[in-house]
Design a protein with these regions (language model features):
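RNase H-like two-metal-ion nuclease catalytic core shared by retroviral integrases
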Residues: 112, 198-200, 206-210, 222-244, ...
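An active-site-proximal beta-strand-loop segment
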Residues: 125-164, 170
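C-terminal domain-tail junction helix/linker
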Residues: 214, 240-302
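RNase H-like polynucleotidyl transferase catalytic core
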Residues: 102-108, 193-200, 214-233, 248-256, ...
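Active-site beta-loop-alpha junctions of metal-dependent nucleic acid enzymes
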Residues: 144, 148, 166-189
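Short, amphipathic alpha-helical "recognition" segments used to contact nucleic acids or chromatin
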Residues: 1-14, 52-59
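Mobile genetic element proteins and their domesticated derivatives, centered on retroelements
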Residues: 21, 31, 51, 69, ...
Length: 302
């Protein structure tokens, strides 16, 4: 259609229109409809602009897929924008080139101590929690820096996917897991009685970690026999999202020092992840927003 309009100066020569339509197998009616429609504004332009605004709010938002973009639009309710179905949101994202496709996933790094005493699997892959600080998962991951590897350990609350304990060091000893637990207990003293689930890595079966578990009155849970990764899938998926959103195709970590890595990871979890990131498992609510709503509902009920 664009070729015909160019050759005929927008339809000024009827003879040329007939010839080009016949050669290119285009009907004259279709061509004239194109002339009427081509200068009209795209009906999804306000929606496209709103989505681009969402992507620029945070550097990690450019990893939003169709679901989180739809949830972000639903939460924010941009002015003068009619929010269509999730499928239409995806089509518009494809049209303007902002659709996100999942990248690689990290592998687990902890190794089991086959001789150590194991704890029972209390969660049995049920990661749903009705209340905060009842079910938590913990794990660690590694990131290569220019000087040495950085090991990141975290505890996630299954209720809202928030990070309630975080610690980083250049070793993956049991002391790192203990520090993570201590940080969580300091920030949330009511964690006493909660279940904290981990894999069967030697850090979590160590005497040092078990003593910390007992000190804070926490119930320890571990993957079932065989160390199947799906038994701690919730935590593995958290690391995958962090690396996809923060690191992959964004930073060359092997050119960064471990101190620099600590800074961006700490900021990512404590500021972005907990307070601003659209979380699909929370129906789009950032973790701390869901938590605030929960406690607000308890006050209203009282």
């Amino acid at each position: 259609m664009k070729f015909i309009a160019l050759k005929t100066k927008d339809g000024s020569s009827k003879g040329n229109i007939t010839f080009f339509c016949r050669v290119l197998h285009v009907s004259r009616q279709g061509y004239y409809q194109y002339l009427v429609m081509k200068d009209r504004p795209w009906k999804y332009q306000p929606l496209a602009d709103a989505m681009k605004d969402i992507l620029t709010e945070d550097i990690c938002n450019d990893t939003y897929g169709r679901t989180r973009m739809y949830q972000a639009l639903t939460m924010k309710q941009p002015k003068n924008v009619d929010i269509p179905s999730e499928r239409t949101v995806y089509r518009v994202m494809e049209e303007i080139g902002i659709s996100h496709h999942p990248r690689r996933k990290p592998n687990g790094i902890t190794k089991a101590d086959r001789e150590a005493r194991k704890s029972e699997d209390l969660l049995k892959r049920d990661f749903h929690a009705e209340e905060p600080l009842t079910k938590c998962v913990t794990d660690m991951t590694e990131i290569k820096g220019c000087d040495e590897k950085l090991y990141v350990s975290a505890i996630f609350d299954c209720f809202d996917s928030s990070v309630i304990g975080l610690a980083m060091d250049t070793n993956m000893k049991a002391s790192l897991c203990k520090e993570t637990l201590e940080n969580a207990a300091k920030a949330y003293p009511s964690i006493r009685g909660a279940i904290i689930h981990s894999d069967r890595g030697m850090q979590y079966t160590s005497q040092l970690y078990r003593e910390a578990i007992q000190k804070y009155g926490i119930q320890q849970s571990m993957n079932s026999a065989g160390g199947r990764c799906h038994d701690n899938a919730r935590c593995e998926s958290m690391w995958a999202r962090m690396k996809t959103e923060l690191l992959y195709d964004r930073y060359d970590t092997e050119k960064m020092t471990t101190d620099e890595l600590k800074t961006i990871i700490w900021r990512y979890f404590t500021s972005y992840w907990n307070n601003r990131r659209i979380c699909s498992t929370n129906r789009g609510l950032p973790p701390m927003i869901k938590r605030q709503q929960y406690y607000a509902s308890l006050k209203e009920a009282a």
